């Protein structure tokens, strides 16, 4: 199979879908890898490293898309790439269709096979291709939230972990999955007072067992969230319904309960966001303010640390890429239920129930 690795062109997206080591593995399995020139540069991987691995360097994205049977990307195709995708071409990337109707319609029209990293699901209901980026995003949400709390950024001027004699910030994490767990551990590790809210009592029991003493757990209800907001400095939105649009857990009216200069970080923004006042931002212009509350809603948070993110992503995606290349997507999805669940669009039809339900299809 011919595998194409185009350069990511979304705003400040510096990751690449495959490392030189990953390319070498695919080539050793009898496949050809074509990489757009400088695609890995911002992640720390040069053209020469890809060439040494056996990959071929192409100059333009048009060349990469034209030659490839399977396109591997990091982020969803953007408008300028729609026309490059052809019928029956396999596109293996994060799509997040539930928050991108225009993208969904474009991919349906293209006739491509869209296999989404975020809905590949194992028998134990874990999402193996979402986990590594969720780990990165969860940790980074605390870094970015802490910066936003600084006075020059428009925040309250609070140090997240406090100092002896001065109380730390209070962090509320909405969602106790991978993102929320990593965010809570990161915040607790630097001394913040953390509350994790989730709708699953078994998950809250588990989190209570593994978290340090400065982390509380709470059943996620509107009433409980409203009670906490007046004393909360930083809220991390980490809610996930696989493939579906995220629910709005904080409405605009609820912002009035918070103190001016408090911060919302919406990690769920790539699935529509879990705050009513959220809209996607970029690394170039990451923060805006609504009713005195700072909103950080960057849709590709891990793109800011591309070296770490690219290695973590390739570790997760490469085994699946090898299966797809060796067997072809149809046989691979017949024999591997987790890959079958990754199928979102095939031959112009939405085949992922969560996406179909979002748009009433």
Predicted regions and their residues:
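An N-terminal-biased, well-structured beta-alpha scaffold segment characteristic
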Residues: 2-106, 110
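Short glycine-/small-residue-rich Rossmann-like dinucleotide-binding loops
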Residues: 69, 75-76, 95-96, 221, ...
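Adenosine-phosphate binding glycine-rich loop
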Residues: 118-159, 269, 274-361
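Glycine/serine-rich phosphate-binding loop and adjoining beta1-alpha1 elements at the start
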Residues: 2, 8, 79-170, 298-300
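Glycine-rich phosphate/diphosphate-binding loop of Rossmann-like nucleotide-binding domains
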Residues: 6-42, 152-240, 287
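Residue-level detector of alpha-helix initiation sites
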Residues: 76, 136, 177-178
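Rossmann-like adenosine-cofactor binding region
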Residues: 209-291
């Amino acid at each position: 199979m011919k595998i194409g690795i185009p350069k990511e062109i979304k705003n400040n997206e510096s990751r690449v879908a495959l490392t030189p080591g990953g390319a070498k593995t695919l080539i050793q399995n009898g496949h050809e890898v074509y990489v757009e020139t400088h695609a890995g540069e911002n992640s720390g991987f040069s053209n020469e490293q890809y060439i040494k691995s056996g990959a071929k360097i192409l100059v333009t994205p048009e060349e990469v898309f034209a030659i490839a049977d399977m396109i591997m990307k990091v982020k969803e195709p953007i408008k300028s790439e729609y026309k490059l995708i052809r019928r029956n071409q396999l596109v293996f990337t994060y799509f997040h269709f539930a928050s991108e109707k225009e993208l969904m319609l474009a991919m349906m029209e293209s006739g491509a096979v869209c296999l989404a990293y975020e809905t590949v699901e194992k028998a134990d209901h874990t999402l193996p291709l979402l986990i590594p980026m969720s780990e990165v995003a969860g940790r980074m949400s605390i870094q970015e939230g802490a910066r936003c709390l600084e006075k020059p950024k428009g925040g309250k001027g609070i140090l997240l972990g406090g100092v002896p004699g001065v109380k730390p910030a209070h962090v509320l994490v909405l969602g106790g999955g991978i993102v929320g767990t990593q965010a809570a551990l990161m915040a607790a590790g630097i001394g913040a007072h953390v509350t994790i809210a989730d709708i699953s009592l078994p998950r809250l029991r588990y989190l209570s067992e593994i978290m340090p003493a400065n982390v509380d757990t709470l059943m996620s209800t509107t009433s409980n969230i409203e009670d906490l907001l007046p004393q909360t400095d930083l809220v991390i939105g980490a809610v996930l319904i696989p493939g579906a649009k995220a629910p709005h857990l904080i409405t605009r009216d609820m912002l009035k309960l918070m103190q001016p200069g408090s911060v919302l970080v919406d990690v769920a923004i790539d699935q529509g966001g879990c705050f009513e006042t959220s809209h996607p931002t970029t690394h170039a212009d990451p923060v805006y303010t609504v009713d005195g509350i700072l909103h950080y809603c960057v849709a590709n948070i891990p793109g800011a640390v591309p070296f770490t993110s690219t290695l973590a992503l390739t570790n997760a995606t490469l085994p699946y890429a090898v299966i797809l290349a060796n067997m072809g997507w149809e046989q691979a999805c017949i024999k591997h239920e987790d890959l079958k669940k990754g199928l979102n669009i095939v031959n112009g039809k939405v085949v992922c129930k969560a996406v179909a339900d979002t748009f009433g299809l």
